[in-house]
């Protein structure tokens, strides 16, 4: 178990371990809880490892030509398989699986992890989380899992400043957003439900429409029901700063890396768990700029 706070560098540690395992002639599978995070990992690993002739492939529920990928895995034409829950499909056979990496381990159930472990007897397992589940910590206590703690963050990172406001103070918050936009900094605005325009409570759709009227085409949205192509386009536009305010559900909770995002707004905060809040707040500690997290109740 690699335990380290959000933004502490768990992914780069995993990448170095993975490269060493592949150098020894084995394959690696990395499982992430969401397609957005799996996509991000694929881009990151492919960029750094392809110059070393390490072949990375992605597999999710929406991947086309799955059978072709299965055949390539069995013939060891794929070194790293990155994906969501699809990677423990019973149809998948590895040539020589040496390491299983489970990112954001607290997001997966016990049976899901066991299914993956059954793919290769004696396979090493690396699990990563800023908020490990009690079951994993109990395994650490009894010596069944070794633990490595990353106790510091990369040099230059600043602590996020967290504040709590009432929903009646939204206008004051909007003024703060305008100041952030003047400095060309980006904003996440998180809500617990998607909703509709007719929703009585504040939901993703109603808040998006409100912000769209104020900030025009600087606002985008994403949630779990957005199709893969649109989700990838929105996230790329956010990375490219074509979108400056991203309204979202917790689909961006884990792993998303946008160094220019410095403000995290979480509305209806009483509807979220502590681990969720900690993960969400970690989305704005990715660069060297001062970041803020505003909780609205």
Model-predicted regions and their roles:
Residues 1-297:
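Inter-lobe coupling/hinge segments of SF2-like helicase ATPases
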